[in-house]
Amino acid sequence: MLEDPLENVLNVVAHCLPMEQAVAVWDSALNKNLIDYPRLQRLPFNGVASQVLANVSRFADSGLESFVRLRLAWLKLRIVPQAWVLGHRVDYLIGDRLILLIDGSQHEGKQRRLDNAHDFELRQRGYEIIRVGYVEVMFDWPAVQLKIMQAIGLGMHLKKR
C-alpha cells in the first residue's frame, strides 16, 4: 500500500479546496497533533498553500470554528479562540465580554445541560452570549454576522464601567 506524506496531502488540499475548507483541514491536522506548526513553516509551500498556512490555528476544535475565525478576521478586534472564562473554554471571546459559542450538529443531552448552566453563570457575571449552531454558520452566515455586528455596535464586547 502506498501512502502520501501528510505534508503532500495538505498541499493538495490547499490547491483543491476553497480557502475556508482548506484552512479547516489544516487546522484539524494541527489540532490532532498530526503535524506541528514549526514543521509546516519549514516546508517549501508556495501560492495558495502559503496563504492557507498564514491562516491556520491549532486552537480550532472544529471546522465550524475555523470558518468562523476566518469570517471574523476583518473585525480588527481582540478575538480569543478557546478562551478560558469562569473555568470553562468558550469558542470565542470577542473584546472583554462578548462570547460566541458554536454548537455542532450533535449538540444535545448532558453536554447541552452543562452548557446551559455555564451560560447562566456567564450572564450572571456580566458576559454577553451569542450561541449559534451548525446550520446557522453553514447556511445563514449573514444572520450570524448581523447578530455579532449588532452586539458590537451596542458595545456588548466592552467592559462595563
Question: Where are the regions that the model predicts?
Answer:
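Hydrophobic alpha-helical segments and helix pairs
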Residues: 1-34
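Surface segments flanking catalytic/ligand-binding clefts of nucleic-acid enzymes
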Residues: 30-161
